[in-house]
Amino acid sequence: MRRTRAIGGALLAGLVLAALLAPVLTPHAPLRQFTDYENAPPMRPHLVSADGRIVWPFVRPVKLVDRLERRFEATRDEVPIRWFNSGVLLSIDESRGPWFPLGTDPLGRDVFSRLLFGARLSLSVAFVASLGALLAGLAVGGVAGFAGGRLETALMAVADFVLVLPAIYVVLALRAAMPLVLSVPQVFWTLSLVLAAAGWPVVARGVRGIIAA
């Protein structure tokens, strides 16, 4: 059991570290579009050259051979992977073709870059929401515990009401009440506030119980 937890913790720490180091680990900006490489396949590194020799890791760029079917084929060109070039851990000479470790999406954006930068945003939402829930829970639980009486009863009734609400339906209801198109900062703060609003009652009840004891 301890070994399983250690492995899980190491994997989680690795994912968090990769997300935090996204600007160094990703070969492209997450919003950069490659119009000639829409839905391009992943381009994995190779260690064995065409003549069977073990060489420095290289990548075979892909080219679009059928624009109608969006079909790509790997070229015979062997482009070596470079270390720490232009502030990026791993990259290739883009004059010989771009490198997409996990391919591209329908808009021609690098999936690997978007995955790591998206993870940063998700981790930020989780951190801000947890901090908001903690602060709100401490405030409400502290007031309820020290005040007592009807105020305590009212605050804990609100906390109980929030606890019984399915969080997913609260998120959907709030999203439906907002404009159809939201900017990234608006989405970030909306998710953070909703998740904080769903999490503060647990903290509040715990703080109130500690004070009352």
Summary of predicted features, one role per range:
Residues M1-L134, L138, G142-V143:
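Gly/Trp-centered helix-boundary motif
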Residues L107-A213:
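Alpha-helical transmembrane segments of integral membrane proteins
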